[in-house]
Structures are given as structure tokens and as C-alpha cells.
Amino acid sequence: MGKPMWRCWALMLMVWFSASATAANGWEIYKSRFMTTDGRIQDTGNKNVSHTEGQGFAMLMAVHYDDRIAFDNLWNWTQSHLRNTTSGLFYWRYDPSAANPVVDKNNASDGDVLIAWALLKAGNKWQDNRYLQASDSIQKAIIASNIIQFAGRTVMLPGAYGFNKNSYVILNPSYFLFPAWRDFANRSHLQVWRQLIDDSLSLVGEMRFGQVGLPTDWAALNADGSMAPATAWPSRFSYDAIRIPLYLYWYDAKTTALVPFQLYWRNYPRLTTPAWVDVLSSNTATYNMQGGLLAVRDLTMGNLDGLSDLPGASEDYYSSSLRLLVMLARGK
């Protein structure tokens, strides 16, 4: 009896270690492909520029995979190269090939939120108050620079400049980081985060544009409270908006806010789901979802068994990021 029991335990340990190694490998591959030695994440699908989105994504991953060395490298590079000491936020884009790598002095609120969220998680995980204080400071700066009252709603502008047009505001619903906002609310006890969650959930529910009934990458909230696809961008549910169901699932895997995405994707077999759809014309991409896009679809549709954080050989930064973020959203 003893030998079979020992073999059973040995097999269980092998399976556990194998699963742990596979999980770590996804992060190790990600670092080797997209992270420089000094902590800069390169967007390989966009001329190797860097942005706060990528820094924040990777900082979250580093916390999840308990990689404090990588986290500190990422955070130190971000502070050194992207910090706006006036606003307390971060310049959104860094182009290493330019004489002035930071030309655009605007921020991207999703990047700021991701960085603050990663710092909050890091402070709690590694019991380091410096990370918590940095997160608190960024949260306050986001409230001061990017969160406003408009049309009776609490909304987060995509950047501090250029998105409030007085008669309407431009929103990017893929910046609605519900799970981060919830953690900020629990940390600070500020009502603004709860109100932002409630109003943004309502807005996503109202962004059922066209016959397909989906939100667009960019949307306009008018002063009268009505919403429409933003006219300065293609009216597509596309590469930005794919993060909406990801963040909704991360916030609440059972939320009914996922239903519009599920209903649309059920119209297509998994491997022939178009990469994007124009919500006004109903025209679709001539190519199909792959990589990280498909991972978000699988997560949303409840097809969880085949999910993997191991990127394909040709997957770029964004697709690989979505893959790993899906695993984080699952808590894996």
C-alpha cells in the first residue's frame, strides 16, 4: 500500500511543478522578447516604442509571477523616463529612435491606472510601504487630472488634454479598469472610485452600437447624456475594445455586462471569428482572431481549458500581453 501511495504523491508533485514551470515560462518568454535589460517594454508591433500601458502591464505581470527584480527594473525605468513631476502622472509614449523620445506631454489614463494598480499589488504582496505610497500619490493625481463630472456621470478622460470638447467628451472604454478601480476604492475609501465604477458600467451597457450591439474603441458622450461612436476614429469594435470584456471578466466573471460580447461571438466558429467589426456598417475584418485576441474571446465565452500564456513564435507585444493578462484575470 505504501509504494502506490508514494507514487501517487510523486505524480501529483510532478504535475504541480510542471504547471508552475509552464506558467513561469510564459512570463520568462515575455521578458526575453519585449523587456530590455534596463526595464523598458518594447511594442514590437509599433516600431519598438514604449508606453505607460506596456510598463503597467508588465509591472502587473511581475507582481503576479513574484518577480521583484523585474518589477523594480520596470518601475525604475518608468520613473526615470516617463514621470511628469508637475502632474504626478506619466508621459504616455517613448520613442527610442527620436531625438526627443518624449514629444507628446499628455498622459494616458489607463497606463497611469495600471502603474498605480501594480504598485498597490506590489506593496501588499511584498510588504513594502514605498510602493503603496507611490500608488496612493498616482491615484490622487489621476483623480485631479483625469476624472471629471460630465452629463451627470463620473468619467475618466483618456488623457488630461484634448478629450473634453465642452459639448461632448471622448472616452476610451478599454481604459475602464474596473478591477483596479475597485482596489483603489478599498485602499482609499474614496467614493469617487465607486461612482466611477457604477457610471462606467452603465456607460458600457449603453454603448451597444449598431446591429451588432457592441462598443467602439473610442466613443463620444454628449452633454445630453447620449452616446455615439467617436467620429475621429473608425467605428470599430477592435484592438482597443477587446480589453473591455477582459477587464469586465477580471472585475466580475459572472457579470451580465459580458453578454453582448458573448452573443456576438456566438455567431462565429471559434477559429473563424473576425478580428474586428465595424459597428455601423457591420463590415468585418478579412482576417480572424489569433493569439491574445482569441484568448480574450475564450475567456469571455468560458472556454478556459485551452488557455495558455505561452505566446506563439510570431506573436507581438500586444498579443502576448493579452495572453498573459487573461491568465492574471483568471487568477492563474
UniProtKB/Swiss-Prot annotation:
EC numbers, comma separated: 3.2.1.4
A molecular function GO annotation: cellulase activity
SUPFAM superfamilies: Six-hairpin glycosidases (SSF48208)
Signal recorded as keyword: yes
Record InterPro entries: 6-hairpin_glycosidase_sf, 6hp_glycosidase-like_sf, Glyco_hydro_8, Glyco_hydro_8_CS
A Pfam family: Glyco_hydro_8
Residues at the catalytic site: E53, D110
Chain's role: Represents only 3% of the global cellulase activity.
Cited Gene3D superfamilies: 1.50.10.10
Signal sequence interval, chain numbering: 1-23
Family of the protein in this entry: Belongs to the glycosyl hydrolase 8 (cellulase D) family.
One BP term from GO: cellulose catabolic process
Catalytic activity, reaction form: Endohydrolysis of (1->4)-beta-D-glucosidic linkages in cellulose, lichenin and cereal beta-D-glucans
Keyword tags: Carbohydrate metabolism, Cellulose degradation, Glycosidase, Hydrolase, Polysaccharide degradation, Signal
The organism of origin for this protein: Dickeya dadantii (strain 3937)
Top EC class of this enzyme: hydrolase
Protein name: Minor endoglucanase Y
